[in-house]
Amino acid sequence: MDMDLNNRLTEDETLEQAYDIFLELAADNLDPADVLLFNLQFEERGGAELFDPAEDWQEHVDFDLNPDFFAEVVIGLTDSEDGEISDVFARILLCREKDHKLCHIIWRE
């Protein structure tokens, strides 16, 4: 893949894109009770956090996950307002290069 550092999604755009994908696909991939829980609790405890891709993504994809071009977004619920996401509903791997639309999701089981 030929990618351009000057043609990347910003961190905010990456988070927004991941959240939009999550909302579109959650009902088909999560237990209905989890979808209900997420929808009821998101306003108070919901969050999306951006990370460099975790090493375990290499078990799911067969290409180099250069953190300049790939990001992992974790979507879920926190235990406190300032806390980290403790109740993960999805981990989303996105390519941040705008011309390479690529997304992989590990859903809560």
From Swiss-Prot:
It comes from the Bacteria. InterPro entries: dsDNA_mimic_put (IPR007376), Put_dsDNA_mimic_sf (IPR036763). Belongs to the putative dsDNA mimic protein family. May act as a double-stranded DNA (dsDNA) mimic. Probably regulates the activity of a dsDNA-binding protein. It comes from Shigella flexneri. SUPFAM superfamilies: Putative dsDNA mimic. This is Putative double-stranded DNA mimic protein YciU.
